[in-house]
Amino acid sequence: MSLFGKMFGSGGKGGKSASPQEAIQRLRETEEMLTKKQEFLEKKIEQELVTAKKNGTKNKRAALQALKRKKRYEKQLAQIDGTLSTIEFQREALENAHTNTEVIKNMGYAAKAMKAAHDNMDIDKVDELMQDIIEQQELAQEISDAISKPVGFGEEFDEDELLAELEELEQEELDKNLLEIGDNVPLPNVPSTSLPSRPAKKKEEEDEDDMKDLEAWAAN
């Protein structure tokens, strides 16, 4: 198949258009073919240059013919370089377009799937379901609280009466301790010796003071 056949296809106007993947693959094959053509022309140019140098002094006519062929090969090589640049640009643009198409397509699939998932959902039913869940959680908590409370098995007592009885017991214990302390503490013994008498000098001074007071009263 010719280069143009590979690039543009061999189908007629009514032929089916190629898919992006097929077009990208064809462009890559064309790039590979042109790259091989480049390598071939570069070798031919080197060969013609060697021939021209070899015959430069011996056979001028052969040298000129080699240079002419070299020029033609260089022209073809330049054309292929330009074509490769164009094909690379086209392939990259097509790959980007294909990527964007796939992304949009997948996003569309996801949107449809989400819509289908929500079609069977009613917001009122969802709210009702959540309310039921909350009520069941509250009921479960109440049951847990009831189970965790200590059970008296029918024995019920007045807590105030129990506290009053406890205070009486504490007071009785306190009084008992005080009595025990009083019985255990010994009283001081009565001194066996007489207390020292008041000094005589001091008693005489007091008597003199009394006499002075009596005389002063009589003088009045």
Swiss-Prot record:
It is a peripheral membrane protein. It holds the Pfam family Snf7. Probable core component of the endosomal sorting required for transport complex III (ESCRT-III). ESCRT-III components are thought to multimerize to form a flat lattice on the perimeter membrane of the endosome. PANTHER family: CHARGED MULTIVESICULAR BODY PROTEIN, CHARGED MULTIVESICULAR BODY PROTEIN 4C. Keywords: Coiled coil, Cytoplasm, Endosome, Membrane, Protein transport, Transport. It comes from Danio rerio. Its main location: cytoplasm. It is found in: Cytoplasm, Cytosol; Late endosome membrane; Midbody. The keyword Transport applies. The gene is chmp4b. Belongs to the SNF7 family. Probable core component of the endosomal sorting required for transport complex III (ESCRT-III) which is involved in multivesicular bodies (MVBs) formation and sorting of endosomal cargo proteins into MVBs. MVBs contain intraluminal vesicles (ILVs) that are generated by invagination and scission from the limiting membrane of the endosome and mostly are delivered to lysosomes enabling degradation of membrane proteins, such as stimulated growth factor receptors, lysosomal enzymes and lipids. Residues 21-88, 123-181 form a coiled coil. InterPro entries: Snf7_fam. The lineage of its organism: Eukaryota, Metazoa, Chordata, Craniata, Vertebrata. Residues 1-22, 180-220 are annotated as: Disordered. This is Charged multivesicular body protein 4b. GO terms for cellular component: cytoplasmic side of plasma membrane; cytosol; ESCRT III complex; late endosome membrane; midbody; multivesicular body; nuclear envelope. One of its GO terms (biological process) is cilium assembly. The keyword Membrane applies.
